[in-house]
From Swiss-Prot:
Naturally occurring in which organism (per UniProt): Ruegeria sp. (strain TM1040) (Silicibacter sp.)
SUPFAM superfamilies referenced in this protein's UniProt entry, alphabetically: Adenine nucleotide alpha hydrolases-like (SSF52402), Class I glutamine amidotransferase-like (SSF52317), GMP synthetase C-terminal dimerisation domain (SSF54810)
UniProt GO MF annotations: ATP binding; GMP synthase activity
InterPro entries assigned: Class_I_gatase-like, GATASE, GMP_synth_C, GMP_synth_GATase, GMP_synthase, GMPS_ATP_PPase_dom, Rossmann-like_a/b/a_fold
Pathway assignment: Purine metabolism; GMP biosynthesis; GMP from XMP (L-Gln route): step 1/1
Protein role: Catalyzes the synthesis of GMP from XMP.
Protein name in the entry: GMP synthase [glutamine-hydrolyzing]
Keyword Nucleotide-binding attached: yes
EC number(s) from the headed UniProt entry: 6.3.5.2
Active-site residue list: 86, 177, 179
Gene name, Swiss-Prot/TrEMBL: guaA
Cystines in this chain: none
Length: 520
């Protein structure tokens, strides 16, 4: 639980796959909220958290099953507004005296349309302007009898109690998911709910910046902090925020493994050292990394070699910094949420950046994680608040192992040099056409095959490359970007004409799933 002076909203997670989207929608409304799994939410916890309102998330279980997830019964007497969503609606009805039934005949999955009843309420302000509202349903059980005190304000063909409310107690319940994209007007419901709950909307990145600067100063005192700087958005914003708080008590270590994009090391070190006046150690260990990777073609082996060497190299340079007691990490809120499974135990894989995984334990350092309350879009907003240039804030994701996983098969210096040049041309083309910000991630992969070509009057036998560009919201699913044929033809021509060593260019149109975004 995080200490904050802002009004707080508690989201009780019953296991929905889209619970994070609820938090995202609320943060967009400048409302501070936290997600906590239902089994951790006791009334002692609620009183300590002191929420101004509560939301019950959806979930995969059935309230008709004995032992299924519940909210603390006393929370209904706590005196704050509550919104129940899908399974959260069923929990509310079940615990307050209504009836929930299982039945395939009334299940709804996918798009549905809700129709209002005659009586309108403030919670539905801005809704039903076109008589019906499109929503996204995902329920097998259904409410067959609402709890005492509730009335119906919206219905759908298979959900006669799609929207219900007890206005006296400020309890609201919907059978659909207002947080998802497929409920186009869903954000309006959240706006109405937080307005009715009395939130001031003071959760801004400016306020967060001031609060976190003070928190870092209190945590660190006069001790020193080390930061593994990658040049990515997360580590860059974390470093800038910590530097604002403690100045030269922060030292950044930029490990150059020889697998970076064209001019990347110089740009990252130059920005932080020369323009932001951070202390940056540029650890150029290209020879070490490429030497260990020589002859290796298995992608998992390459990842493990790079990860282990990174830790060894980082520790070597960190040991030279006297008095360092803290390690800075760019942990984000989704990482914190995903590190605990719905059952309350450790998840199968706790997400950790390969660059810093295992470092705190190995080095005996305490963690400074100034971004652990933020989503990715909030990190970008904080970066702008801190004055970082858009060229860094808006960068596409770049994997820790770098170009190693964009070079299937064995890695050689020659292939890396070819790949850097081709990738630089591709990104230049995307920027020239004004497409960079429309794309989640774009890169070139050099393929482990040579193909025959003709250039001038001569025969060539050079590498083929694949262009990759995807659109995505969170990287979990992705679709290829629909470039025009003109763009692809122009880009392929530039790469083949300007990069010695490539004579064939393809465009990867695989979605995720079944493919992954990266080639390895």
């Amino acid at each position: 639980m995080t200490e904050t002076a802002h009004d707080r909203l508690l989201i009780i997670d019953f296991g929905s796959q889209v619970t994070q989207l609820i938090a995202r929608r609320l943060r967009e409304l400048n409302v501070y909220c936290e997600i906590h799994p239902y089994q951790n939410v006791t009334m002692d916890f609620v009183r300590e958290f002191a929420p101004k309102a509560v939301i019950f998330s959806g979930g995969p279980d059935s309230v008709t099953r004995e032992g299924s997830p519940r909210a603390p019964q006393e929370i209904f007497d706590y005196g704050v507004p509550i919104l129940g969503i899908c399974y959260g609606q069923q929990v509310m009805m079940h615990q307050l005296g209504g009836t929930v039934q299982s039945g395939h005949g009334t299940a709804e999955f996918g798009r549905a349309y809700v129709t209002p009843t005659e009586e309108r309420i403030d919670m539905l302000s801005g809704w039903f302007l076109d008589q019906t509202e499109q929503v996204w349903m995902s329920h097998g059980d259904h409410v067959s009898e609402i709890a005492p005190g509730f009335k119906v304000y919206g219905t759908s063909p298979n959900a006669p109690f799609a929207i219900t409310a007890d206005l006296e107690r400020n309890f609201y319940a919907v059978q659909f998911h207002p947080e998802v994209h497929h409920t186009p007007n869903g954000k309006t419901l959240y706006e109405n709910f937080v307005r009715l709950a009395g939130f001031s909307g003071d959760w801004t990145m400016g306020a967060y910046r001031e609060q976190m600067v003070e928190t870092i100063r209190e945590q660190v005192g006069d001790k020193k902090v080390i930061c593994a700087l990658s040049g990515g958005v997360d580590s860059s914003v974390a470093a800038a925020l910590i530097h604002e708080a403690i100045g030269d008590q922060l030292t950044c270590v930029f490990v150059d493994h020889g697998l970076l994009r064209k001019n990347e090391a110089e740009e990252v070190v130059g920005m932080f050292r020369d323009h932001m006046n951070l202390q940056v150690i540029h650890a150029d260990e290209t020879e070490l990394f490429l030497g260990e990777l020589e002859g290796q073609s298995d992608p998992e082996t390459k990842r493990k070699i790079i990860g282990k060497l990174f830790i060894d190299v980082f520790q070597k340079y960190a040991d030279q910094i006297e008095g360092a007691e803290f390690l800075a990490q760019g942990t984000l809120y989704p990482d914190v949420i995903e590190s605990v499974s719905f059952s309350g135990g450790p998840s199968v894989t706790i997400k950790s950046h390969h660059n810093v995984g295992g470092l705190p334990e190995k080095m005996g350092l305490k963690l400074v994680e100034p971004l652990r309350e933020l989503f990715k879009d909030e990190v970008r907003a904080l970066g702008r608040e801190l004055g970082l240039p858009d060229s860094f804030i808006g960068r596409h994701p770049f994997p820790g192992p770098g170009l190693a996983i964009r070079c299937p098969g064995e890695i050689t210096r020659d292939k890396l040099d070819i790949l850097r040049e081709a990738d630089a041309i591709y990104i230049d083309q995307i920027r020239k056409h004004g497409l960079y910000d429309e794309i989640w991630q774009a890169f070139v992969a050099i393929l482990p095959v040579r193909t025959v070509g003709v250039m001038g009057d001569g025969r060539t036998y050079d590498y083929a490359c694949a262009l990759r560009a995807v659109t995505s919201v969170d990287g979990m699913t992705a679709d290829y970007y629909p470039f025009s044929h003109e763009f692809l033809g122009e880009t392929a021509t530039r790469i083949i004409n300007e990069v010695k060593g490539i004579n064939r260019c393809t465009y990867d149109i695989t979605s995720k799933p079944p493919g992954t975004i990266e080639w390895e």
